[in-house]
Amino acid sequence: MIIKTLEEYNNVNSIDHGEKIVVFKIGTEWCEPCKTLQTTLEKFDDIVIYNMDMENEVFQSFYEENHILNIPYCICKYENVVFRFKGLLSEESLKDKFTFLRLT
């Protein structure tokens, strides 16, 4: 799902996703590592992916406040725990991060 406004982002943040990890993936359509990361994330059945476009000016203040300068960038949330990472991670690395996130 693509998030196009801050209101949509806030609404999604307030939804109870149960046992699923919520991943906000920030990137662009032209970014090859972003596409690769998307494909890797889609292999996980226990996450929900929301995409945000780095070039969407609506989010510029959000990106600045959160010091998001590079893509791909992900904000992963599980219950009250937040994990962030930038760049491309392997499937195994993501699996380890998601397991750790659930145990925290």
Regions found by a protein language model. Name each.
Residues M1, V48-Y50, V82-K86:
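Structural signal for short hydrophobic segments within the conserved structured cores
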Residues M1-V22, D96-T104:
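N-terminal leader/targeting and pre-domain segments
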Residues I3-E7, K25-G27, Q38, D45-S61, ...:
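Thiol-based oxidoreductase modules, predominantly thioredoxin-like and allied folds used
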Residues V12-D16, Q60-N66:
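Short amphipathic alpha-helix with an adjacent loop that forms part of the alpha/beta core around
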Residues V22-F24, Y50-M52, I75-C76, R84:
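Ordered hydrophobic segments in well-structured contexts
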Residues C31-C34:
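Short cysteine clusters
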Residues T36-L37, S90:
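Residues at alpha-helix caps and immediate loop-helix transition turns in enzyme cores, especially N-
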Residues N70-T104:
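Non-catalytic, surface beta->alpha helical segment in thiol-disulfide oxidoreductase systems
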